[in-house]
Swiss-Prot record:
This is Arginine deiminase. One of its GO terms (molecular function) is arginine deiminase activity. Gene3D superfamilies: Arginine deiminase, L-arginine/glycine Amidinotransferase, Chain A. It is found in: Cytoplasm. Its EC number is 3.5.3.6. Belongs to the arginine deiminase family. One of its GO terms (biological process) is arginine deiminase pathway. It catalyses: L-arginine + H2O = L-citrulline + NH4(+).
Length: 406
Protein backbone atom coordinates (compact mmCIF):
# COMPACT_ATOMS: atom_id res chain seq x y z
CA UNK A 1 0.00 0.00 0.00
CA UNK A 2 1.43 3.34 -1.06
CA UNK A 3 1.72 6.24 1.34
CA UNK A 4 -0.08 9.44 0.41
CA UNK A 5 0.48 12.37 2.74
CA UNK A 6 1.19 16.01 2.00
CA UNK A 7 2.28 17.81 5.14
CA UNK A 8 3.39 21.15 3.73
CA UNK A 9 4.26 23.19 0.65
CA UNK A 10 8.00 23.09 1.27
CA UNK A 11 8.94 19.76 2.89
CA UNK A 12 10.82 17.22 0.78
CA UNK A 13 8.68 16.37 -2.24
CA UNK A 14 8.67 12.60 -2.80
CA UNK A 15 5.93 11.77 -5.30
CA UNK A 16 4.00 13.86 -7.81
CA UNK A 17 1.39 13.42 -10.55
CA UNK A 18 1.90 15.20 -13.90
CA UNK A 19 0.08 15.15 -17.24
CA UNK A 20 2.11 15.32 -20.43
CA UNK A 21 0.55 17.42 -23.23
CA UNK A 22 -1.43 15.15 -25.54
CA UNK A 23 -4.40 14.97 -27.92
CA UNK A 24 -6.42 17.53 -25.96
CA UNK A 25 -3.93 20.31 -26.74
CA UNK A 26 -3.80 19.27 -30.40
CA UNK A 27 -7.51 20.04 -30.51
CA UNK A 28 -7.10 23.61 -29.30
CA UNK A 29 -7.84 26.06 -32.11
CA UNK A 30 -8.20 29.84 -32.34
CA UNK A 31 -11.98 29.35 -32.48
CA UNK A 32 -12.32 27.13 -29.39
CA UNK A 33 -9.39 28.03 -27.14
CA UNK A 34 -11.28 30.68 -25.18
CA UNK A 35 -14.13 28.27 -24.42
CA UNK A 36 -11.53 25.75 -23.25
CA UNK A 37 -9.91 28.39 -20.99
CA UNK A 38 -6.72 28.93 -22.99
CA UNK A 39 -5.58 32.31 -24.28
CA UNK A 40 -3.78 30.88 -27.30
CA UNK A 41 -2.93 27.68 -29.14
CA UNK A 42 0.34 25.96 -28.26
CA UNK A 43 2.93 24.08 -30.24
CA UNK A 44 2.06 20.69 -28.76
CA UNK A 45 5.32 19.05 -29.79
CA UNK A 46 7.42 21.79 -28.20
CA UNK A 47 5.20 21.87 -25.11
CA UNK A 48 5.73 18.12 -24.78
CA UNK A 49 9.49 18.54 -24.98
CA UNK A 50 9.38 21.25 -22.31
CA UNK A 51 7.20 19.05 -20.12
CA UNK A 52 9.67 16.17 -20.47
CA UNK A 53 12.42 18.47 -19.20
CA UNK A 54 10.21 19.41 -16.24
CA UNK A 55 9.49 15.75 -15.41
CA UNK A 56 13.15 14.76 -15.77
CA UNK A 57 14.23 17.66 -13.55
CA UNK A 58 12.02 16.19 -10.81
CA UNK A 59 13.29 12.65 -11.40
CA UNK A 60 16.88 13.86 -11.17
CA UNK A 61 16.04 15.22 -7.73
CA UNK A 62 14.88 11.76 -6.63
CA UNK A 63 11.16 12.51 -6.93
CA UNK A 64 8.76 9.84 -8.21
CA UNK A 65 6.81 11.10 -11.24
CA UNK A 66 3.49 9.45 -12.07
CA UNK A 67 1.74 10.40 -15.31
CA UNK A 68 -2.01 10.88 -15.36
CA UNK A 69 -2.48 9.00 -18.64
CA UNK A 70 -0.67 5.96 -17.23
CA UNK A 71 -2.76 6.04 -14.06
CA UNK A 72 -5.98 6.38 -16.05
CA UNK A 73 -5.00 3.55 -18.41
CA UNK A 74 -4.25 1.26 -15.47
CA UNK A 75 -7.51 2.25 -13.77
CA UNK A 76 -9.44 1.19 -16.88
CA UNK A 77 -8.10 -2.35 -16.35
CA UNK A 78 -10.60 -2.54 -13.47
CA UNK A 79 -13.97 -3.45 -15.00
CA UNK A 80 -16.03 -1.44 -12.49
CA UNK A 81 -13.89 1.63 -13.11
CA UNK A 82 -14.29 1.42 -16.88
CA UNK A 83 -18.05 0.94 -16.64
CA UNK A 84 -18.40 3.88 -14.23
CA UNK A 85 -16.29 6.20 -16.38
CA UNK A 86 -18.17 5.34 -19.55
CA UNK A 87 -21.50 5.90 -17.78
CA UNK A 88 -20.41 9.29 -16.44
CA UNK A 89 -18.66 10.54 -19.57
CA UNK A 90 -21.15 9.20 -22.14
CA UNK A 91 -24.48 10.21 -20.65
CA UNK A 92 -27.86 9.14 -22.03
CA UNK A 93 -29.13 12.65 -21.38
CA UNK A 94 -26.32 14.22 -23.38
CA UNK A 95 -26.42 11.91 -26.40
CA UNK A 96 -29.77 10.13 -26.21
CA UNK A 97 -30.17 6.57 -24.92
CA UNK A 98 -29.60 4.61 -28.14
CA UNK A 99 -26.62 6.61 -29.41
CA UNK A 100 -25.03 6.71 -25.95
CA UNK A 101 -25.39 2.93 -25.60
CA UNK A 102 -23.75 2.37 -29.01
CA UNK A 103 -20.85 4.69 -28.18
CA UNK A 104 -20.29 3.13 -24.76
CA UNK A 105 -20.23 -0.35 -26.30
CA UNK A 106 -17.73 0.73 -28.96
CA UNK A 107 -15.47 2.48 -26.45
CA UNK A 108 -15.65 -0.49 -24.06
CA UNK A 109 -13.92 -2.68 -26.67
CA UNK A 110 -11.16 -0.15 -27.28
CA UNK A 111 -7.60 -0.76 -25.97
CA UNK A 112 -7.34 0.97 -22.61
CA UNK A 113 -4.55 3.36 -23.53
CA UNK A 114 -6.54 4.54 -26.53
CA UNK A 115 -9.65 4.92 -24.38
CA UNK A 116 -7.66 6.93 -21.82
CA UNK A 117 -6.44 9.12 -24.67
CA UNK A 118 -10.04 9.92 -25.61
CA UNK A 119 -11.16 10.43 -22.00
CA UNK A 120 -8.72 13.33 -21.81
CA UNK A 121 -8.38 14.27 -25.48
CA UNK A 122 -12.01 14.15 -26.53
CA UNK A 123 -13.90 12.32 -29.26
CA UNK A 124 -15.39 13.68 -32.50
CA UNK A 125 -18.26 12.39 -34.60
CA UNK A 126 -15.77 11.78 -37.39
CA UNK A 127 -13.88 9.23 -35.28
CA UNK A 128 -16.74 6.82 -34.63
CA UNK A 129 -17.44 3.83 -36.90
CA UNK A 130 -19.71 4.42 -39.88
CA UNK A 131 -21.84 1.52 -38.64
CA UNK A 132 -23.10 3.66 -35.74
CA UNK A 133 -26.08 5.45 -37.25
CA UNK A 134 -28.44 7.74 -35.38
CA UNK A 135 -30.38 10.98 -35.72
CA UNK A 136 -27.86 12.58 -33.38
CA UNK A 137 -25.05 11.65 -35.79
CA UNK A 138 -27.03 12.90 -38.78
CA UNK A 139 -27.48 16.34 -37.22
CA UNK A 140 -23.80 16.94 -36.35
CA UNK A 141 -20.68 17.79 -38.33
CA UNK A 142 -17.85 15.27 -38.30
CA UNK A 143 -15.66 17.75 -36.38
CA UNK A 144 -18.21 18.32 -33.61
CA UNK A 145 -17.30 16.79 -30.26
CA UNK A 146 -19.11 13.89 -28.63
CA UNK A 147 -16.72 14.37 -25.70
CA UNK A 148 -14.95 17.70 -25.57
CA UNK A 149 -11.19 17.68 -24.94
CA UNK A 150 -9.80 18.41 -21.49
CA UNK A 151 -6.62 20.43 -22.20
CA UNK A 152 -6.56 21.79 -18.65
CA UNK A 153 -5.70 18.31 -17.36
CA UNK A 154 -2.18 19.70 -17.93
CA UNK A 155 -2.70 21.53 -14.63
CA UNK A 156 -2.99 18.53 -12.32
CA UNK A 157 -2.79 20.79 -9.27
CA UNK A 158 -6.37 21.96 -9.67
CA UNK A 159 -8.49 18.84 -10.09
CA UNK A 160 -7.45 17.28 -6.79
CA UNK A 161 -5.27 18.37 -3.92
CA UNK A 162 -3.77 16.32 -1.09
CA UNK A 163 -3.97 17.96 2.31
CA UNK A 164 -2.26 16.18 5.20
CA UNK A 165 -3.82 12.67 5.39
CA UNK A 166 -6.47 13.11 2.72
CA UNK A 167 -7.51 14.46 -0.65
CA UNK A 168 -10.10 16.87 -1.98
CA UNK A 169 -11.41 15.85 -5.41
CA UNK A 170 -12.46 19.27 -6.47
CA UNK A 171 -15.77 20.43 -7.98
CA UNK A 172 -14.42 22.68 -10.73
CA UNK A 173 -15.88 26.10 -11.45
CA UNK A 174 -15.88 26.11 -15.25
CA UNK A 175 -17.82 23.66 -17.47
CA UNK A 176 -14.68 23.11 -19.57
CA UNK A 177 -13.00 21.47 -16.57
CA UNK A 178 -15.77 19.69 -14.71
CA UNK A 179 -15.30 16.30 -16.44
CA UNK A 180 -11.67 16.21 -15.28
CA UNK A 181 -12.91 15.42 -11.79
CA UNK A 182 -14.47 12.12 -12.92
CA UNK A 183 -11.13 10.85 -14.21
CA UNK A 184 -9.53 11.59 -10.84
CA UNK A 185 -12.45 10.13 -8.89
CA UNK A 186 -11.98 6.86 -10.80
CA UNK A 187 -8.22 6.81 -10.23
CA UNK A 188 -8.49 7.41 -6.49
CA UNK A 189 -11.28 4.84 -6.11
CA UNK A 190 -10.00 1.97 -8.26
CA UNK A 191 -6.32 2.32 -9.19
CA UNK A 192 -4.27 -0.25 -7.23
CA UNK A 193 -2.01 2.48 -5.87
CA UNK A 194 -4.96 4.18 -4.18
CA UNK A 195 -7.78 1.62 -3.87
CA UNK A 196 -6.70 0.25 -0.49
CA UNK A 197 -5.08 3.45 0.72
CA UNK A 198 -5.67 4.70 4.24
CA UNK A 199 -6.62 8.27 3.38
CA UNK A 200 -9.61 10.58 3.75
CA UNK A 201 -11.70 11.96 0.90
CA UNK A 202 -12.65 15.37 2.23
CA UNK A 203 -14.82 16.77 -0.52
CA UNK A 204 -16.02 16.30 -4.09
CA UNK A 205 -16.43 12.51 -4.34
CA UNK A 206 -20.22 12.41 -4.47
CA UNK A 207 -22.67 12.28 -7.36
CA UNK A 208 -24.29 15.60 -6.54
CA UNK A 209 -24.51 19.10 -7.96
CA UNK A 210 -22.09 21.21 -5.92
CA UNK A 211 -23.62 24.36 -7.40
CA UNK A 212 -21.64 27.38 -6.13
CA UNK A 213 -19.45 25.33 -3.75
CA UNK A 214 -16.51 25.16 -6.18
CA UNK A 215 -12.88 24.63 -5.26
CA UNK A 216 -9.66 24.32 -7.25
CA UNK A 217 -6.28 23.12 -6.00
CA UNK A 218 -4.37 26.12 -7.30
CA UNK A 219 -6.05 28.09 -4.52
CA UNK A 220 -5.02 25.65 -1.77
CA UNK A 221 -1.65 25.95 -0.03
CA UNK A 222 -0.84 23.40 2.69
CA UNK A 223 1.44 25.69 4.65
CA UNK A 224 2.00 23.10 7.40
CA UNK A 225 1.81 23.03 11.19
CA UNK A 226 -1.89 22.29 11.03
CA UNK A 227 -2.71 25.25 8.80
CA UNK A 228 -4.09 25.57 5.28
CA UNK A 229 -4.19 28.78 3.21
CA UNK A 230 -6.97 29.06 0.61
CA UNK A 231 -7.54 31.83 -1.90
CA UNK A 232 -11.08 32.85 -2.80
CA UNK A 233 -10.65 33.56 -6.49
CA UNK A 234 -12.70 33.49 -9.67
CA UNK A 235 -12.64 29.68 -9.33
CA UNK A 236 -12.82 28.96 -5.57
CA UNK A 237 -15.80 30.30 -3.65
CA UNK A 238 -16.42 30.98 0.06
CA UNK A 239 -18.95 28.13 -0.07
CA UNK A 240 -16.29 25.71 -1.28
CA UNK A 241 -13.85 26.94 1.37
CA UNK A 242 -16.40 26.33 4.13
CA UNK A 243 -17.11 22.76 3.03
CA UNK A 244 -13.41 21.90 2.87
CA UNK A 245 -12.66 23.60 6.20
CA UNK A 246 -15.47 21.71 7.95
CA UNK A 247 -14.18 18.40 6.56
CA UNK A 248 -10.60 19.15 7.64
CA UNK A 249 -11.75 19.99 11.16
CA UNK A 250 -14.13 17.02 11.37
CA UNK A 251 -11.28 14.64 10.57
CA UNK A 252 -8.83 16.55 12.81
CA UNK A 253 -6.47 17.18 9.91
CA UNK A 254 -6.12 20.94 10.37
CA UNK A 255 -6.42 23.41 13.21
CA UNK A 256 -7.01 26.50 11.10
CA UNK A 257 -7.83 27.56 7.57
CA UNK A 258 -6.80 31.02 6.39
CA UNK A 259 -9.10 32.35 3.66
CA UNK A 260 -7.93 35.32 1.60
CA UNK A 261 -9.96 37.20 -1.00
CA UNK A 262 -8.27 37.56 -4.38
CA UNK A 263 -9.00 39.95 -7.26
CA UNK A 264 -11.43 38.28 -9.67
CA UNK A 265 -9.48 38.54 -12.90
CA UNK A 266 -7.62 36.25 -15.28
CA UNK A 267 -4.06 37.02 -14.19
CA UNK A 268 -5.05 36.15 -10.62
CA UNK A 269 -7.17 33.09 -11.38
CA UNK A 270 -5.67 31.06 -8.52
CA UNK A 271 -3.76 31.92 -5.37
CA UNK A 272 -0.66 30.11 -6.63
CA UNK A 273 -0.44 32.43 -9.65
CA UNK A 274 0.40 35.24 -7.23
CA UNK A 275 1.79 33.49 -4.14
CA UNK A 276 3.75 30.34 -3.29
CA UNK A 277 5.54 29.10 -0.16
CA UNK A 278 9.23 28.52 -0.89
CA UNK A 279 11.03 28.29 2.47
CA UNK A 280 10.06 28.02 6.13
CA UNK A 281 9.57 31.77 6.51
CA UNK A 282 9.55 32.81 2.85
CA UNK A 283 6.82 33.36 0.28
CA UNK A 284 7.04 34.46 -3.33
CA UNK A 285 4.32 37.06 -3.95
CA UNK A 286 2.93 39.46 -6.47
CA UNK A 287 2.51 42.58 -4.28
CA UNK A 288 -1.19 43.01 -5.04
CA UNK A 289 -2.11 39.99 -2.92
CA UNK A 290 -0.49 41.31 0.28
CA UNK A 291 -1.89 44.84 0.20
CA UNK A 292 -3.19 45.98 3.62
CA UNK A 293 -6.75 46.28 2.28
CA UNK A 294 -6.96 42.64 1.13
CA UNK A 295 -9.64 40.86 3.16
CA UNK A 296 -8.50 37.81 5.12
CA UNK A 297 -10.11 35.54 7.70
CA UNK A 298 -8.98 32.65 9.88
CA UNK A 299 -11.46 29.80 10.27
CA UNK A 300 -11.23 27.50 13.29
CA UNK A 301 -13.60 24.89 14.77
CA UNK A 302 -16.32 26.40 16.96
CA UNK A 303 -16.65 23.26 19.10
CA UNK A 304 -20.17 22.50 17.81
CA UNK A 305 -19.35 21.20 14.34
CA UNK A 306 -19.39 24.66 12.80
CA UNK A 307 -16.86 27.35 12.00
CA UNK A 308 -15.56 30.29 13.98
CA UNK A 309 -14.50 33.16 11.73
CA UNK A 310 -11.90 35.74 12.78
CA UNK A 311 -11.14 38.76 10.60
CA UNK A 312 -7.38 39.25 10.27
CA UNK A 313 -5.65 42.62 10.08
CA UNK A 314 -3.44 41.40 7.21
CA UNK A 315 -2.63 38.18 5.41
CA UNK A 316 0.99 38.45 6.53
CA UNK A 317 -0.05 38.61 10.19
CA UNK A 318 -2.29 35.56 9.73
CA UNK A 319 0.60 33.61 8.19
CA UNK A 320 3.02 34.56 10.96
CA UNK A 321 0.52 33.43 13.60
CA UNK A 322 -0.23 30.14 11.83
CA UNK A 323 3.43 29.27 11.28
CA UNK A 324 4.62 30.49 14.68
CA UNK A 325 7.29 32.77 13.26
CA UNK A 326 8.13 36.39 14.06
CA UNK A 327 8.38 37.75 10.53
CA UNK A 328 7.45 36.36 7.14
CA UNK A 329 9.90 37.16 4.35
CA UNK A 330 8.31 38.19 1.06
CA UNK A 331 10.10 37.97 -2.28
CA UNK A 332 8.13 40.08 -4.72
CA UNK A 333 8.00 39.67 -8.49
CA UNK A 334 11.16 41.11 -10.05
CA UNK A 335 11.87 44.05 -12.31
CA UNK A 336 10.19 47.42 -12.70
CA UNK A 337 6.40 47.77 -12.80
CA UNK A 338 6.21 46.65 -16.42
CA UNK A 339 8.62 43.74 -16.04
CA UNK A 340 6.91 42.58 -12.85
CA UNK A 341 3.51 42.53 -14.53
CA UNK A 342 4.92 40.58 -17.47
CA UNK A 343 6.70 38.07 -15.25
CA UNK A 344 3.65 37.53 -13.04
CA UNK A 345 1.66 36.84 -16.23
CA UNK A 346 4.38 34.32 -17.13
CA UNK A 347 4.10 32.56 -13.75
CA UNK A 348 7.20 33.91 -12.03
CA UNK A 349 5.49 33.38 -8.66
CA UNK A 350 4.14 29.95 -9.61
CA UNK A 351 7.13 27.85 -8.63
CA UNK A 352 7.18 24.29 -7.29
CA UNK A 353 9.17 23.91 -4.09
CA UNK A 354 11.08 20.61 -3.91
CA UNK A 355 12.46 21.15 -0.43
CA UNK A 356 13.08 24.28 1.65
CA UNK A 357 14.79 26.89 -0.51
CA UNK A 358 14.87 24.85 -3.74
CA UNK A 359 12.25 25.50 -6.43
CA UNK A 360 11.51 24.72 -10.08
CA UNK A 361 10.42 27.65 -12.25
CA UNK A 362 10.44 28.98 -15.78
CA UNK A 363 13.84 30.20 -16.98
CA UNK A 364 12.23 33.11 -18.86
CA UNK A 365 11.45 35.02 -15.64
CA UNK A 366 14.94 36.45 -15.33
CA UNK A 367 14.18 39.36 -13.00
CA UNK A 368 12.30 37.31 -10.43
CA UNK A 369 14.78 34.43 -10.65
CA UNK A 370 17.55 36.92 -9.92
CA UNK A 371 15.70 38.05 -6.78
CA UNK A 372 15.32 34.42 -5.69
CA UNK A 373 19.04 33.88 -6.14
CA UNK A 374 19.93 36.96 -4.10
CA UNK A 375 17.60 35.75 -1.34
CA UNK A 376 19.36 32.38 -1.19
CA UNK A 377 16.66 30.45 -3.05
CA UNK A 378 17.93 27.93 -5.63
CA UNK A 379 15.94 27.92 -8.87
CA UNK A 380 16.10 24.84 -11.10
CA UNK A 381 15.13 26.45 -14.43
CA UNK A 382 12.92 24.81 -17.03
CA UNK A 383 11.88 26.14 -20.45
CA UNK A 384 8.33 27.42 -20.71
CA UNK A 385 7.92 29.31 -23.96
CA UNK A 386 5.03 27.01 -24.94
CA UNK A 387 3.89 25.58 -21.60
CA UNK A 388 3.70 29.08 -20.16
CA UNK A 389 1.17 30.12 -22.79
CA UNK A 390 -1.36 27.97 -20.94
CA UNK A 391 -1.05 30.38 -17.96
CA UNK A 392 0.37 27.87 -15.53
CA UNK A 393 3.81 27.27 -14.06
CA UNK A 394 5.54 24.38 -12.31
CA UNK A 395 3.19 24.40 -9.32
CA UNK A 396 0.08 24.45 -11.52
CA UNK A 397 1.36 21.48 -13.52
CA UNK A 398 2.01 19.23 -10.52
CA UNK A 399 -0.12 17.41 -7.95
CA UNK A 400 2.00 16.30 -4.98
CA UNK A 401 1.01 12.87 -3.67
CA UNK A 402 3.63 12.59 -0.95
CA UNK A 403 5.51 15.40 0.75
CA UNK A 404 7.09 15.78 4.17
CA UNK A 405 5.76 18.17 6.78
CA UNK A 406 7.75 20.95 8.45
Amino acid sequence: MEKHFVGSEIGQLRSVMLHRPNLSLKRLTPSNCQELLFDDVLSVERAGEEHDIFANTLRQQGIEVLLLTDLLTQTLDVADAKAWLLDTQISDYRLGPTFAADIRAWLADMPHRELARHLSGGLTYGEIPASIKNMVVDTHDINDFIMKPLPNHLFTRDTSCWIYNGVSINPMAKPARQRETNNLRAIYRWHPQFADGDFIKYFGDENINYDHATLEGGDVLVIGRGAVLIGMSERTTPQGVEFLAQALFKHRQAERVIAVELPKHRSCMHLDTVMTHIDIDTFSVYPEVVRPDVQCWTLTPDGRGGLKRTQESTLVHALETALGIDQVRLITTGGDAFEAEREQWNDANNVLTLRPGVVVGYERNIWTNEKYDKAGITVLPIPGDELGRGRGGARCMSCPLERDGI
